[in-house]
């Protein structure tokens, strides 16, 4: 019947459109470290002037076996702090001109630990500098911060935890020379430095755990590529017009 033919045609047309959308979603997903779930993929389609609901995108993802990568945990080496608590100067200053800095552990294919130091602008949420080293020492954090200070307007505050690298004479002296006040997380409260911790978690979830790194050189290259993507292309759910997490 004419009605049957119309229904059959409509379904076939929808199937063809779904097939095209699935291919496009897969391309966007693969080009963004397989990091995007339905909300970010929907926004990516909107950037292409293709407007579809989150539920539809979620259905197409499920049918195409497209899944956002998931976080997994690992047990990292621990460090000790032998200093008294120092003040958190930015706790009640959410709009302060402040940077945050932290060190995280990354593992090569052979099981060797290496160390990534990163500096985050707390206002723009962008990574200003980073460095990877086989040793977790004062030189790592000093040279990483110097990179930030050489290319960006200096902050009023720098917030870190109380690891020995950040309380070392060399690091504290660098801050004093640049007239930057040092703010510290409370001992045993890593969430005081949540934004830089969140970035390192995203890095591991969205990139590190998907690949193997036979050498520190391979890791340095891939982390640099990821950070460029994070700063310039990653879709923000908080503000979709801003391409940063």
Predicted features, each with a name:
Residues 2-96, 189, 244-245:
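Basic, flexible linker segments flanking DNA-binding modules
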Residues 3, 25, 41, 57, ...:
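Mobile genetic element proteins and their domesticated derivatives, centered on retroelements
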Residues 11, 23, 176-180, 202-245:
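C-terminal domain-tail junction helix/linker
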Residues 68, 181-182:
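Hydrophobic beta-strand scaffold residues
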Residues 77-81, 160-162, 168-172, 182-204, ...:
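RNase H-like two-metal-ion nuclease catalytic core shared by retroviral integrases
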Residues 95-128, 134-135:
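An active-site-proximal beta-strand-loop segment
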Residues 112, 130-152, 167:
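Active-site beta-loop-alpha junctions of metal-dependent nucleic acid enzymes
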Residues 145, 152-167, 240-243:
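Acidic/histidine-rich, metal-coordinating catalytic segments
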